[in-house]
């Protein structure tokens, strides 16, 4: 019974954290994006034989910097200067 109560409490905390939103800045922002977007792993590494097309796709670095189709607001404006939810942060993957 206690296990179920702890499990429900943990699920509630996780859901509240994703709804409430947090500020993600600097290293915390980059580490969170790296954790949430494993397909982007290695894109920020300077070593290796990756070309620009492999790192940023065929649309180039400007498209990646803008967050794809997110418009003019970038991930820093959205999640550092203001709070954002984990769902909003996932849109930058």
UniProtKB/Swiss-Prot annotation:
Where does it primarily localize? secreted
PANTHER family this protein is in?
INSULIN-LIKE GROWTH FACTOR II (PTHR46886:SF1)
The subcellular localization recorded is: Secreted
The signal peptide annotation in the UniProt record is 1-21
Q: List the disulfide bonds.
A: 25-80, 37-93, 79-84
This protein's UniProt keywords: Cleavage on pair of basic residues, Disulfide bond, Hormone, Secreted, Signal
What protein name is recorded for this chain? Bombyxin-related peptide B
Give the source lineage, highest ranks first.
Eukaryota, Metazoa, Ecdysozoa, Arthropoda, Hexapoda
